[in-house]
Amino acid sequence: MKKQLVNMKGTKDGFVLRLDDQCAYSDLVEELKKKVLEGGIDGKVDVQLYLGYRYCTDEQIDELIHIVQETEQLIVASVQSEVLTVHESNQKMIESQQDTYLGVVRSGQILRSSGDIIIVGNVNPNGRVEAGGNVYVLGKLKGIVHAGVQGNKEAIIAASQFEATHIMIADQVEAMSDEHVKEINQAEMTCAFIGYDGRITYDQIHALKNIRPLLNVSKGGS
């Protein structure tokens, strides 16, 4: 039985077109053309192209999108790949680096790191910390923190005492009121992260093992 090189699966948001990542590119193109011409679709539908571990040039991706959208019913909403571009790979390497700062981040001071940063000390009101990765404050966090400044939505902010005025993770921003600080300021170290709903949420630090399991692996924890 001939192996299917293109599989189409329906989802609540439209369709996912899974493209074989082992076959010759020319064979994939031919089967994709046949698949999208099968018809049976009413109206316009969003499609996600999933390339798996196949590396495609920009020109090849444009060609695949063009083939799918020739039908007019199918609209490519996104292209997903497990292959990192050089830029993405470099960015991950930068974000995996870790800096340690011993001391107080004072009012008006800005502390920056391209990767993770561990602060052993307090972040005073109007002190600011910016990091490409995660921010850990082993002390009182009373200033402003931006984790994942390059858009890393997996970044977290953790502090022994969480009293920040503003926190940002990737493109999400939250101003914290006194009431909010009282609600989240547990006896244990508190962390902030982007939850499943796309909003900043809070939990105790021990919950990170379930919330960000890869964080535990990447830092060599147990």
Curated annotation (Swiss-Prot):
This is Probable septum site-determining protein MinC. Transmembrane segments: none annotated. Interacts with MinD and FtsZ. The keyword Cell division applies. Belongs to the MinC family. GO terms for biological process: cell morphogenesis; division septum assembly; regulation of cell septum assembly. InterPro entries: CAP/MinC_C, MinC, MinC_C_sf, MinC_N_1, Septum_form_inhib_MinC_C. SUPFAM superfamilies: Cell-division inhibitor MinC, C-terminal domain.
